[in-house]
Every structure is written in structure tokens, then in C-alpha cells.
Design a protein with these regions (language model features):
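N-terminal core-binding DNA-recognition domain of tyrosine recombinases/integrases
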Residues: 2-3, 14-29, 39-108
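Acidic, low-complexity proline/glycine-rich segments
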Residues: 1-9
Length: 108
């Protein structure tokens, strides 16, 4: 993920990324990894919950409008299903899936 791609993320996620860079002093690379993991997670959820038109590709799925109510509606089962998706569909290895878990857990 590139720094300019962060603007396409939900405002709450953008604020979180600023916090971890400014206050928690994470490196720019770490912030971009978190951003990419969260973007993947939210795109997955929007597609799975049917909140994106079926003719819109995964990469073009708009997640910028995700709000606090949407985030509050996310369940542990959603996270588990996401990890299964990462393993089976994205072919993420164990280390990548573990990093994604950390990114999501720290955000929530």
C-alpha cells in the first residue's frame, strides 16, 4: 500500500493510522502494513455483507463510507471467516495471516 492510498480508507481508520504513527511511533512501513491489512479486511466485509454492487471488483470496492456503526457490527465470526478467506482465496501463509490478526486486533 502507498501512503496516498490511505485517503481511500474510512476516516476512523485514517485517524487510527495517524495515532499509531504519531503517538505510538510506529515506522511508516508498519503503518502502511496496518493500512493494507485493514483495507483488505474491510473490503472483504463489505463484499461479504453484500454492501457493494456485484459488478464492482474487489479492488474497486469502496470502503471510505464505513462508519462506527458498521465497525461495531463486526463479530468475531466475521474475523474468523476473513482468516479462512485469507488462507483459501488469497493463499496467505501463516505469518501473513498472523500479521493481519495483529493489525485488526490492535485497531479494535
Amino acid at each position: 500500500m502507498r501512503r496516498e492510498d490511505i485517503n481511500a480508507l474510512p476516516k476512523l481508520v485514517q485517524q487510527y493510522l495517524v495515532y499509531i504513527e504519531a503517538i505510538k511511533e510506529h515506522s511508516e512501513l508498519s503503518v502502511l502494513e496496518y493500512a493494507g491489512d485493514l483495507r483488505t479486511f474491510f473490503r472483504y466485509l463489505v463484499k461479504e455483507k453484500g454492501l457493494s454492487p456485484t459488478d464492482v471488483s474487489y479492488e474497486d470496492t469502496d470502503i471510505s463510507k464505513i462508519d462506527l456503526d458498521f465497525i461495531k457490527s463486526i463479530t468475531l465470526n466475521d474475523a474468523y471467516q476473513f482468516l479462512i478467506y485469507c488462507k483459501n482465496e488469497r493463499r496467505n501463509n501463516e505469518a501473513t495471516r498472523a500479521r493481519r490478526v495483529v493489525s485488526i486486533r490492535r485497531c479494535f
